[in-house]
Amino acid sequence: MINSDPNEGIGYGVRVYGYNNGKKSDPFFEYTPYRLRFFAQYFNTTKNAQYHQLSLDMPYVANTQWRLRADALLTITPTTLYFGVGESTLKPLTYHERNQPGAPQVTNGQYGLQESTFQYQRPGGSGDPIELGGRLYSGVSSGPGFNVTDRMYNRYTIQTPQLNFSTERSFFHGTVRLVAGFRLSNNIVHVNDGKFVKSVDPIFEGTPLSNSGQVPNAKTKLTEDAEAGKILGYHGGFVNTAKIGLVYDTRDFEPDPNSGVFLEGTYEKASKTIASDFDFQKYFGHAKFFYSPFPKTFEKLVLASRFGFGISDGNVPFFEYRNLWGTENTVSGLGGLRTLRGYKQDRFVGRAMGFGTLELRWKFWSFSVGGEYFALNLVPFWDFGRVWNDEHKAGLTDYKYSQGLGLRIAWNQATIIMMDYAVSREDKQLFVNFSHAF
């Protein structure tokens, strides 16, 4: 396994599968590819973002229409980004030139320029922290010898061991599915305040007088919002939820559809009665549409679109605003690989999140090598989305947009390799991964 992500670096790992295909005498032998599938995954990246997983899938368990899934996961992501919660995240990026207080301010900034500017040292103040011997101190007097950097201003680390269990029942020849389950997780949050990190001398960099090197990271955006009382969950905590979803699915081929629709509605509830540290609920609706307008002219030309809207209500910890449970996969905060691809992952999160994508998938060449079949698809796409503080004020204005071009390689039909390049007003990103964006 290998991928490339502009935020997490180059990923590498291995997944080992085990199958029980059942016997030909089984009543469901012709309807399912296996009776039991298990896999173990190790995955890391060059920036140490880790995704490890054990997964069990049992279709038609005990010769019934029920399907059971269980997953144990451990994610450790020191690359996690935080820009705030709610409509405030829709504001353009700003920073001072060379990160110096009192210097001209850049508004409507580019992410890459802001990130590189935050690496510069600036004079520290009494409110800036410093970590010594594993303890965090503040109140250091301002002076020429105390410099800090904002290199990690928008970053934190979250470590999440998690257990997911779900059961699924199909109706009407599989077009309707009822899904229910639970999630148990412990979310361990580490901030970068006061940690010594690499920095750049704003004046003498590149000269013998340069003072570049390790200095304390100043107060982060996450800490600022916690101290201002804007967020919950600064110290992490347990999130245990029960969830239920209903699906209507007429896609002709799930990994790479030519036609059909996929509609889902889900509800997820966290409660202290099931040992969660937080009480909240989430509502999520998601629709995907696939249509081949000229099947007699093009071997494969598909108009693909999807639209989603979710609400997180109650005492929601900040790290949960970025997760909306879908029956096929979790939709993360807007930005990154699957939504608004021209923006960084979790660039926009809030109580209410709306998003959509339009794609044109055109197969322009296919060939075989050593008995393996490959099909090349050109995919122009357009993403849009935004967040709201109040779902009742959701509308059709002030959306963020990104557009781009993708190359999708279908390998023996079911495996899709994606290479997407996306552009927005704020950033440019290249992704290499597996499966379609939706």
Feature-to-residue mapping (PLM):
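Transmembrane beta-strand segments that form the barrel wall of outer-membrane beta-barrel proteins
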Residues: 1-4, 26, 30-44, 52, ...
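Short loop/turn motifs that connect adjacent beta-strands in outer-membrane beta-barrel proteins
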Residues: 8, 22-35, 61-68, 172-178, ...
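Short sequence motifs at beta-strands and strand-loop junctions characteristic
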Residues: 6, 46-48, 153-159, 234-238, ...
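C-terminal outer-membrane beta-barrel translocator/porin domains of Gram-negative envelope proteins
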Residues: 207-214, 219, 224-235, 239-369
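Transmembrane beta-strands of outer-membrane beta-barrel proteins
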Residues: 36-40, 66-72, 176-180, 242-244, ...
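Hydrophobic, lipid-facing positions within transmembrane beta-strands of outer-membrane proteins
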Residues: 12-14, 50-54, 159-165, 240-244, ...
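Sequence/structural signature of outer-membrane beta-barrel proteins
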Residues: 5, 19-23, 39-47, 61, ...
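Gram-negative/organellar outer-membrane beta-barrel architecture
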Residues: 1-234, 243, 338, 422-438
